[in-house]
Amino acid sequence: MIATALRQVGAVGLALGIAAAASRAHAADASPWDGDARSSVRLIADGPDGATLRAGVEIRLAPGWKTYWRYPGDSGVPPRFDFAQSSNVKSVTLSWPSPRRFVDDGGQAIGYEGDVIFPLRILANNPAQPVVLRLKIDYAVCEKLCVPAEGSAELPLAAAALASANEPALAAAEARVPKPASIGDRSTLAIRSLQKRGNFFL
């Protein structure tokens, strides 16, 4: 009887340990938000794609506020992403989702509003060792006036091999990244043909 009770206690302890580990793994798929009432930023992660780790920089903007694309238009400042303090990271490739155009007193601007995720593809120096992604970001947010913003985030990616609730959002952001169009591609706006006349292409 005592042995049965001990087995039951052990089973309960094991179940609680598994639940706690799952909770920690789930929490590790996103860093805390860093920002203020106008905007905030965090890192999110998903499981790996082969040797590449998938993650994203998420910026959340308050209603009426916007931030900018890499080519901001007549006004504005593009975000600057710094991953230099990351651990065991060989390279980080950041993609820019398709932006929208805004017209205001400063002219035409190109950027984002609401919630935007910049997809990341990360290669580790040593895939057998944990990866810690560290971000510092400088960006601008604008309503009627533009103000500078900054943020930082840190996210260990070792637990990202597990399924993540961020996968649909990351997949949607990746789908918004413009794809290069080949000459003659009829599925999207593309150059159908090139003809050279003298020093000019027509």
Regions found by a protein language model. Name each.
Residues G17-A25:
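Hydrophobic membrane-targeting alpha-helices
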